[in-house]
């Protein structure tokens, strides 16, 4: 998508603020339904990040898979839970909550310093000339299909086996 610079920057700031607010909502909201809806906002913002870089297929796939399936499944699972354990009592922090928040903030600050200290201009994207010609002649969906059936065949099959084992494990645990 060819947007002018200021509009592109405003769009990225809007999506980034949606990500931050949604992430804070997932962590800080005590009602699990509201937390699941905040997770849906985060997943929508992540999928919309792919549109300015002309990755429409990835954006649509993430919307369908994550927001359309995973988040709806989470909302249904939360709705079937017993709501009495989420009362409106005063919630006091425990030692585990303090240690967890300390670890998470230290990881956050280490990531921020690592990202700010990295020289991003030193990273060079190398492509061969025939790859550039191939990218011009085929669409994004065709490129994904070609790479999945040639270069990424083994990792794709391994991921499908892992997902199948996880699904069978979840079904067997649900029956018990």
UniProtKB/Swiss-Prot annotation:
Keywords: Chloroplast, Membrane, NAD, NADP, Plastid, Plastoquinone, Quinone, Thylakoid, Translocase, Transmembrane, Transmembrane helix, Transport
GO cellular component terms given for this protein: chloroplast thylakoid membrane
Annotated compartments: Plastid, Chloroplast thylakoid membrane
Catalytic activity line of the entry: a plastoquinone + NADH + (n+1) H(+)(in) = a plastoquinol + NAD(+) + n H(+)(out); a plastoquinone + NADPH + (n+1) H(+)(in) = a plastoquinol + NADP(+) + n H(+)(out)
Coiled-coil blocks: none
A Pfam family per the record: Oxidored_q3
Signal sequence coordinates: none
Enzyme Commission numbers on file: 7.1.1.-
Enzyme superclass (EC): translocase
Any one Gene Ontology molecular-function term assigned to this protein's record: NADH dehydrogenase (ubiquinone) activity
Subunit structure: NDH is composed of at least 16 different subunits, 5 of which are encoded in the nucleus.
Family: Belongs to the complex I subunit 6 family.
General function of this protein: NDH shuttles electrons from NAD(P)H:plastoquinone, via FMN and iron-sulfur (Fe-S) centers, to quinones in the photosynthetic chain and possibly in a chloroplast respiratory chain. The immediate electron acceptor for the enzyme in this species is believed to be plastoquinone. Couples the redox reaction to proton translocation, and thus conserves the redox energy in a proton gradient.
Record-given protein name: NAD(P)H-quinone oxidoreductase subunit 6, chloroplastic
Organism lineage: Eukaryota, Viridiplantae, Streptophyta, Embryophyta, Tracheophyta
